[in-house]
Design a protein with these regions (language model features):
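Alpha/beta-hydrolase-fold catalytic nucleophile elbow
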Residues: 63-64, 126, 150-153, 178, ...
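Short, proline-enriched alpha-helix->beta-strand connector loops that line the catalytic pocket
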Residues: 170-175, 201-203
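C-terminal catalytic histidine-bearing segment of alpha/beta-hydrolase fold enzymes
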Residues: 189-236
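Short alpha-helix in the alpha/beta-hydrolase fold that links the catalytic acid
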Residues: 43-48, 163, 187-197
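Short beta-strand/loop motif that positions the catalytic acidic residue
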Residues: 176-179, 183
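Serine-hydrolase catalytic machinery in alpha/beta-hydrolase-like enzymes
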Residues: 4-121
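Conserved alpha/beta-hydrolase "nucleophile elbow" surrounding the catalytic nucleophile
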Residues: 34-36, 123-128, 180
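Primarily recognizes the serine-hydrolase "nucleophile elbow" in alpha/beta-hydrolase
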Residues: 119-170
Length: 236
């Protein structure tokens, strides 16, 4: 598969993004959110690792998170989807205002894909670490059916509001969650509990653990490719 590069988009009011296309006139899209301190280029190379030749052309959209001070890092300003005030992942300790603010920005990117001819039903919302947290939060509360949610090395935030905020359109959306068993940043068991909670709410979650740390390994990428191929083939 040869993926075409397109420049970062400067659309007024939208997050800047890096884009890759697997062909002309994309019919599907994957909006992929990076982790804390990274940027939209972080996962750009994985496009060349995937083999989607049997699928219609896909547009990969890698947004850059806003710059903000991160409390747990001494107030250092970096790209972050929300502030992290402590390493305590107890329910209710997330910086909910920042999560919601980022979710609103991702909603705007979803709307732009709609305007470019790709309906929500052909869009996968994906993310790693902080990006996965925002992908889960946004996708489960999105009012129109998505093709899927891909959440790597992360956890489900704001569980206390999910029952009242979850949208019926995505109650059966395919979800792939994966986590490194030696993750020292976001505990493996936290990710596993998040998947278990979603399964208890009857979301169709595929959960995978891997012998890696806070990163994505080759075996995981192969499983992600298989899952994406399946959900996008069903959607497109």
């Amino acid at each position: 598969m040869t993926a075409e590069k397109t420049p970062a988009t400067p659309d007024c009011g939208l997050l800047p993004t890096v884009e890759r296309q697997t062909g002309e006139s994309p019919q599907c899209a994957i909006i992929w959110l990076h982790g804390l301190g990274a940027d939209g280029h972080d996962f750009e190379p994985i496009v060349d690792e995937f083999d989607f030749d049997q699928l219609p052309a896909i547009r990969f959209v890698f947004p850059h998170a806003p710059m903000r001070a991160v409390t747990i890092n001494g107030g250092y300003v970096m790209r972050a989807w929300y502030d992290i005030v402590s390493a305590d992942f107890a329910p209710g300790r997330e910086e909910s205002e920042g999560v919601r603010e980022s979710a609103s920005k991702i909603e705007s990117l979803l709307a732009r894909e709609n305007a470019r001819g790709i309906p929500d039903s052909r869009i996968v919302l994906a993310g790693f670490s902080q990006g996965g947290v925002v992908a889960l939060h946004t996708g489960l509360r999105h009012s129109r059916r998505l093709a899927g949610i891909l959440a790597l090395s992360c956890y489900l935030p704001m569980t206390d509001t999910l029952s009242t905020e979850a949208q019926p359109a995505n109650r059966d959306v395919p979800i792939f969650m994966a986590h490194g068993q030696a993750d020292a940043v976001i505990p493996y068991e936290l990710g596993k509990r998040s998947a278990k909670l979603l399964k208890a709410l009857n979301y169709p979650v595929q959960w995978q653990g891997y012998a890696t740390e806070h990163s994505v390994c080759l075996e995981e990428l192969h499983d992600v490719e298989s899952w994406l191929t399946r959900v996008l083939a069903d959607a497109c």
